[in-house]
Amino acid sequence: MIDLDAATFLLQWAVGGLFFLWVTGRRREVGIGYGWTIRITFGLMAAGGLVVGVVMDPVPVREASGAAVLVATVVAMVVSVVRRRAGVAGQRGVEERRTARVAAMTGIDRDRVTFDDSVREFPPALDLVAPVLGLVGLVAAGVDAGDPALLAVARTLVGALFLGAVTSAMLLGHWYLVQPGL
């Protein structure tokens, strides 16, 4: 019987969500604010998992991995904020085409958004660091969850992917519902 606790669940959710942030952001098509939303959301889940794990039923490797996920997420967030003036390459082209199309149809022209070409863009690979670090903690949590260990690890990893995919898809869909001009 597998024994799954809240700390493992929160780490699964955070790692899966952060992995799918990399999946959706690696082609440079989603806006910078979406990355901020995802990093904050899943960073808080990683922090919650770390706190619950330390207080309730510590698994040292899981907690160390959770702390590393949290630090990597904060670092990625800081780099993203520092480089925000560069914008996102794929989004720039889409925004310019849509603005021109709306202006042609309605005669309403929006102010052009300017980007700073002297600032480097956020490197999408940085979003992969936290999930890779979290993978170690998920394996440790799966082994700790019960026998058979291989099955418990597989359930933990598949659960992380499922939670991350579903939550990221919902957040992405709702993010674009509230974006003006899309």
What label would you give each PLM region?
Residues 2, 58-65, 151-157:
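Interfacial loop-to-helix junctions that mark the boundaries of transmembrane helices
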Residues 34-104, 116-123, 139-144:
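Membrane-interface helix-loop-helix modules in multi-pass inner-membrane proteins
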Residues 26-37, 147-151, 180-181:
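Membrane-interface helix-boundary motifs at transmembrane edges
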Residues 8-29, 168-170:
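N-terminal signal-anchor/start-transfer transmembrane helix
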Residues 13, 66-72, 158-160:
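Hydrophobic core segments of alpha-helical transmembrane domains in multi-pass membrane proteins
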Residues 1-15, 154-159:
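Hydrophobic transmembrane alpha-helical segments in integral membrane proteins
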Residues 3, 22-34, 58-61:
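An N-terminus-focused feature that recognizes amino-terminal "leader" regions
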Residues 84-182:
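Long, contiguous internal "core" modules enriched in hydrophobic/ aromatic residues
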